[in-house]
Amino acid sequence: MNARLTGLGLNLLSFAVGIGGWYLLTATGAVVLPGPVDVLERAVTLLLNGQLVGDIFASLRRVLSGFVLGVALAIPVGFLMGWYRIARSLIEPWVQFFRMIPPLAVIPLAIVTLGIDESPKIFVIFLASFLSSVVATYQGVISVDRTLINAARVLGAKDATIFARVIVPASVPFILVGVRIGLGSAWATVVAAELIAAQSGLGYRMQQAQLYYDLPTIFVSLVTIGILGLFMDRLLQAADRRLTQW
């Protein structure tokens, strides 16, 4: 508990120092950017007129839809690749092929083939999340200590038992790392997708603000994305601690 409180205190101190440095840089004119007070005032305005809340829900809906779908498919595919050599040989080249293509490069193709509604945005988020998570899951399976597997076989365990009792628990830390990376990829992708083709969302709001050189609104969107991403990452860290207490 003391270590956790110390860590929280250091987190808060780090944020305070960062915001203080930001304030000093803008107040002294060292950088031509809006200060924390200006950004806070704009955030309050956007909250009161409902724009910020609407943008948050629009971006969250897209992120969660694509992220959950991507992770839900990545975990079984990763286990399949790691457990069966034939599946690995069939699937792994395609995974590596698509990993080399930035999901953002797929956006124009997705818009042409899927239309301009929510489908292309969710698809590219799904792709980014899937590719990040599937590799981590696969790596977790093939990294399991062979001694544990051989010991289970000596004790008479069947493949299904070894998979459920040895492979899955040993792979959980790798899976959660992949999920966290996938979450970051999802947020990066949704912002880019909204910059190109959207009528709502935090990325769309930044693109509109750019047209009018509205820096405070751009900063509000950036800070909001950072806060939402940090909160979701902390939830995943809590799940990691709960699932890997052993």
From Swiss-Prot:
Membrane-spanning segments: 12-32, 63-83, 94-114, 122-142, 172-192, 211-231
Top-level taxon in the UniProt lineage: Bacteria
Main location, first listed in the record: membrane
Compartments in which it is found: Cell inner membrane
Its membrane topology: Multi-pass membrane protein
Pfam family of the protein (one): BPD_transp_1
Boundaries of every ABC transmembrane type-1 domain copy: 56-236
Record has Lipoprotein as a keyword: no
GO terms under biological process: transmembrane transport
Keywords carried by this UniProt record: Cell inner membrane, Cell membrane, Membrane, Transmembrane, Transmembrane helix, Transport
Cellular component terms (Gene Ontology): plasma membrane
PANTHER family the record matches: ABC TRANSPORTER PERMEASE PROTEIN MJ0413-RELATED (PTHR30151:SF0), ALKANE SULFONATE ABC TRANSPORTER-RELATED, MEMBRANE SUBUNIT (PTHR30151)
Function recorded in the entry: Probably part of an ABC transporter complex. Probably responsible for the translocation of the substrate across the membrane.
Complex formation: The complex is composed of two ATP-binding proteins (BMEII0108), two transmembrane proteins (BMEII0107) and a solute-binding protein (BMEII0109).
Assigned protein family: Belongs to the binding-protein-dependent transport system permease family.
Protein name listed in UniProt: Probable ABC transporter permease protein BMEII0107
Native organism: Brucella melitensis biotype 1 (strain ATCC 23456 / CCUG 17765 / NCTC 10094 / 16M)
